[in-house]
């Protein structure tokens, strides 16, 4: 999968789309791509070659959100957590448009279809 190439430094994050929350902030590992109007706040880890597309919201204000290597969050999706319910997305995952993921675990190489809702403590297996 080819993603738009980031500009130096290795990650392209336009000003104003990320924010710290109670000393929690984005940790970007390797090269990745984040759309200019995506909202990312709090304790978020984005692994190498991952992407977050237009109008997506990642809120790590309560627990950590991890976006695995080569995974993508498509347009309009919302990712959030609750106390004791972090959100983990494995490698090679595609999260379709307008998906709601809340405090769940998505294993490697999985497709989450357009408009899906997956809530606290749910676990979706590989493939």
Q: For the regions a protein language model found, what residue spans apply to each?
A:
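Residues at secondary-structure transition points
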Residues: 23, 61-62, 83-84
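Terminal amphipathic alpha-helical/low-complexity segments used for targeting or macromolecular assembly
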Residues: 1-31, 37, 43
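Left-handed beta-helix
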Residues: 30, 35-36, 41-42, 47-48, ...
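Sequence/structural signature of small/polar-enriched beta-strand/turn repeats
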Residues: 2, 26, 46, 64-67, ...
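Polar low-complexity intrinsically disordered regions enriched in Ser/Thr and small residues
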Residues: 19-22, 63, 106
């Amino acid at each position: 999968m080819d993603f738009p190439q980031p500009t130096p430094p290795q990650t392209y994050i336009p000003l104003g789309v990320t924010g710290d929350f109670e000393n929690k902030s984005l940790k970007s590992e390797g090269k990745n791509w984040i759309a200019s109007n995506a909202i990312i706040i709090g304790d978020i880890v984005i692994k190498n070659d991952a992407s977050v597309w237009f109008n997506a919201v990642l809120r790590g204000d309560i627990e950590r959100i991890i976006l695995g290597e080569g995974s993508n969050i498509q347009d309009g999706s919302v990712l959030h957590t609750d106390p004791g319910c972090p959100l983990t997305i494995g490698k090679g995952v595609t999260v379709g448009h307008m998906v709601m993921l809340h405090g769940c675990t998505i294993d490697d190489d999985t497709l989450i279809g357009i408009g899906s809702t997956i809530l606290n403590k749910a676990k979706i297996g590989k493939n």
